[in-house]
Design a protein with these regions (language model features):
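Mg2+/Mn2+-dependent nuclease catalytic core
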Residues: 119-226
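Acidic, carboxylate-rich catalytic segments that either coordinate divalent cations
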Residues: 229-230
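Metal-dependent nuclease catalytic cores that hydrolyze phosphodiester bonds in DNA/RNA
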Residues: 1-132
Length: 230
């Protein structure tokens, strides 16, 4: 059974809104911050456009939708597992999604290291960094409070391919600290592949704070250059 920690305050509600293809989160005072995912998408934009041109729109759309659905299904299973849904109920609920359920069962070996869960699928923001986002999980991983992100992939990733994952996790750690005044240093990325393998990457947040600053600046420069408005 996973233990869930009751926090001393609730997170403020945010409203998600898409503007010019980018996601923003609106605070209760009406101001909006871009999602950290949208912020980081600017860095990859040229590569994604080149890939779509190379494979064609039809193939690109198929691959993108398949990956998004796979990720959503596995995330839902992980959330139910961490919420202590009985094994037989979890299986009955999800087993028809065969590929995703198979990937989830592989990932379970790594999920056993998660406990004392603070937040799941939590919307947060940072006034300091002027970004927002939805974090998969904040909990202890192998006994250390961590930002934990669950990723699915067709095949294994090299570490230098996934710098954005670490920057994203760093942003969530900063958001959490700003709201709850408790520091998180460890970023954990758990990847499960269609090949039946898992990868665990653990990083120190401090390593990626300069990259976060650079990414946020790059996004707002892009907004100004392209005449976009949030």
């Amino acid at each position: 059974m996973k233990n869930h920690i009751k926090l001393d305050q609730e997170l403020p509600e945010l409203k998600a809104k898409n503007v010019d293809g980018k996601r923003f989160y609106e605070k209760q005072d009406g101001s909006r911050y871009p999602s950290i995912t949208s912020v980081l998408s600017i860095k990859n934009n040229e590569g994604i456009l080149a890939w779509r041109k190379r494979v064609g729109e039809e193939v690109a759309n198929y691959v993108s939708i398949k990956a998004a659905n796979r990720g959503t299904y596995v995330h839902n299973m992980v959330e139910d597992y961490l919420n202590n849904l009985p094994t037989n109920e979890l299986e009955d609920k999800h087993k028809k999604k065969f590929l995703a359920y198979t990937m989830f069962t592989v990932l379970k070996d790594k999920l056993k290291h998660i406990d004392n869960i603070h937040l799941q699928e939590a919307q947060m923001y940072s006034d300091k960094w002027t970004v927002a986002g939805r974090c998969d999980c904040i909990a202890e991983y192998e006994g250390e409070l961590s930002v934990i992100d669950f990723k699915t992939s067709t095949s294994e990733k090299k570490e230098d391919w996934i710098e954005n994952y670490f920057i994203q996790g760093t942003a969530y750690a900063e958001m959490y600290e700003e709201h709850f005044h408790k520091s998180i240093n460890q970023i954990v990325i758990l990847i499960v592949t269609e090949e039946g393998t898992t990868q665990v990457f653990k990083k120190d947040k401090k390593e990626f704070l300069p990259k976060l600053e650079e990414s946020v600046k790059q996004f707002y420069d892009w907004i100004e250059k392209n005449g976009k408005s949030n």
